[in-house]
Amino acid sequence: MKLKGEAVLITGGASGLGRALVDRFVAEGAKVAVLDKSAERLAELETDHGDNVLGIVGDVRSLEDQKQAASRCVARFGKIDTLIPNAGIWDYSTALVDLPEESLDAAFDEVFHINVKGYIHAVKACLPALVASRGNVIFTISNAGFYPNGGGPLYTAAKHAIVGLVRELAFELAPYVRVNGVGSGGINSDLRGPSSLGMGSKAISTVPLADMLKSVLPIGRMPEVEEYTGAYVFFATRGDAAPATGALLNYDGGLGVRGFFSGAGGNDLLEQLNIHP
């Protein structure tokens, strides 16, 4: 047990990668608080893990909800050693040309409020506890934080923003809090899309990612969600990762070394925009 006696707060921890992280961190001996919007899934977590998990219903877009989560984690477990801002939505690779003008502002706000502001809120709310424990923050990024075509412009821009956030906060919070990021790859999960684009009930598990990634990734398959959790355990383990801050870990099956399949992503733009030169 690498994390025995540690206290962890995870946002978006009731499904997908977040759920796998909860399971792994509990297995490593940690106590885990989870902020999530689904009361039903939080209840399942508490049933499965008993006193090792505290479920907190809330919205990551609300600073007050994030502060309540931090307060309840400290009240229950005495501290916060590791914060994992993880809640997010995906834009289902909706290209700029396909974004409806009437929905663009709302979609931008929704993606950035959850995927970026929600992360900033989490750190702001937990900062006193993290400084007190000489703790660490591990941001869930995505391969879209490093390469194009891991999403549309909204998702890709949001994830690139998190890369900048890792670097800035690693500087601002040193030497008291370490800040790192994990750029995971495709996951078969319940990850939803923006409600403002009519994708609020659409899950990424409906996309045939396994077949797509099998021919793209150098490792020849899509990793199982549980396989991503080891990187987070590494960064959270004080004895193993004490020198690590500002680190960005590409953890996506080798996507960055696969080479390019096409030099241009806009080969169909003329047809899409009905332009006839």
Swiss-Prot record:
Alphabetized GO MF terms: cis-2,3-dihydrobiphenyl-2,3-diol dehydrogenase activity; oxidoreductase activity, acting on NAD(P)H, oxygen as acceptor
EC code(s) of this entry: 1.3.1.56
Chemical reaction(s) catalysed: (2R,3S)-3-phenylcyclohexa-3,5-diene-1,2-diol + NAD(+) = biphenyl-2,3-diol + NADH + H(+)
Keywords associated with the record: Aromatic hydrocarbons catabolism, NAD, Oxidoreductase
Binding site for substrate: 142
Keyword Oxidoreductase: yes
Top EC class of this enzyme: oxidoreductase
One Pfam family here: adh_short
Coiled-coil regions, chain positions: none
Pathway(s) annotated for this protein in UniProt: Xenobiotic degradation; biphenyl degradation; 2-hydroxy-2,4-pentadienoate and benzoate from biphenyl: step 2/4
InterPro entries in the record: BphB-like_SDR, BphB_TodD, NAD(P)-bd_dom_sf, Sc_DH/Rdtase_CS, SDR_fam
Cleaved signal peptide residues: none
GO BP terms, alphabetized: catabolic process
Catalytic site: 155
Gene3D superfamilies: NAD(P)-binding Rossmann-like Domain
Residues that bind NAD(+): 9-36, 59, 159
Family listed: Belongs to the short-chain dehydrogenases/reductases (SDR) family.
NCBIfam families tied to this protein: BphB_TodD, PRK06200.1
Name of this chain's protein: Cis-2,3-dihydrobiphenyl-2,3-diol dehydrogenase
Species the sequence originates in: Paraburkholderia xenovorans (strain LB400)
